[in-house]
From Swiss-Prot:
Protein name from the UniProt record: Candiduxin-2
Listed transmembrane segments: none
Family membership noted in the UniProt record: Belongs to the three-finger toxin family. Short-chain subfamily. Orphan group IX sub-subfamily.
UniProt xrefs under InterPro entries: Snake_3FTx, Snake_toxin-like_sf, Snake_toxin_con_site, Toxin_cobra-type
Record Gene3D superfamilies: CD59
Entry keyword set: Disulfide bond, Secreted, Signal, Toxin
Disulfide bridge map: 24-45, 38-62, 66-78, 79-84
């Protein structure tokens, strides 16, 4: 009986990590400070940056995929660790 209980405890602890949710920076400042919890299906953090009107624009957040299209001077960076899109 003790073996069964120990097995159930170990399995429960192992399964608790399955609900892990990624966090990514989500603000548009040069030095990001706020984060968001990504939905379960979001595997990437992204950072888009481009120059518009002589000013650098930045967009950050969570993404399903990692877009690799770079056009019109737009720089796109993707990563898979928490808060890696600073």
């Amino acid at each position: 009986m003790k073996t069964l209980l120990l097995t159930l405890v170990v399995l429960t602890i192992a399964c608790l990590d399955l609900g892990y949710t990624k966090t990514c920076f989500n603000d548009n400042l040069a030095n990001p400070k706020t984060t968001e919890l990504c939905r379960h299906s979001m595997y990437f953090c992204f950072k888009n940056s481009w120059i518009a009107g002589g000013v650098e624009r930045i967009e950050r957040g969570c993404s399903l995929t990692c877009p690799d299209i770079k056009y019109n001077g737009k720089y796109i960076y993707c990563c898979t660790r928490d808060n890696c899109n600073a």
